[in-house]
UniProtKB/Swiss-Prot annotation:
The keyword Chaperone applies. This is Co-chaperonin GroES. One of its GO terms (biological process) is chaperone cofactor-dependent protein refolding. It comes from the Bacteria.
């Protein structure tokens, strides 16, 4: 993947959502909400606080979905990042 975000943006790969409940009930794809956390895949040169491979939590309606190398990613403004998961 060769993508460099511009401005104050980062590229995030959403973390896999849970496909079953704790009691074993399978959740269909159309009933699942997209996860609000992911792993940072690329960072613009203007961002210092977030690094590649950091796990971040972001706002529900933030970002733009894109597809690179048959993988789905989210381009987020840094203001939409709520925090780094440690």
């Amino acid at each position: 993947m060769n993508f460099q975000p511009l401005g104050k943006r980062i590229l995030v790969k959403r973390l896999e959502e849970m496909k079953t409940t704790a009691s074993g009930i399978i959740i269909p794809d159309n009933a699942k909400e997209k996860p609000l956390n992911g792993e940072v895949a690329a960072v613009s040169k203007e961002i210092e606080d977030v690094k590649v491979n950091d796990k971040v939590m972001f706002a529900k309606y933030g970002g733009t979905e894109i597809k690179l190398d048959n993988e789905e990613y989210l381009v987020l403004n840094i203001e939409d990042v709520l925090g780094i998961i440690k």
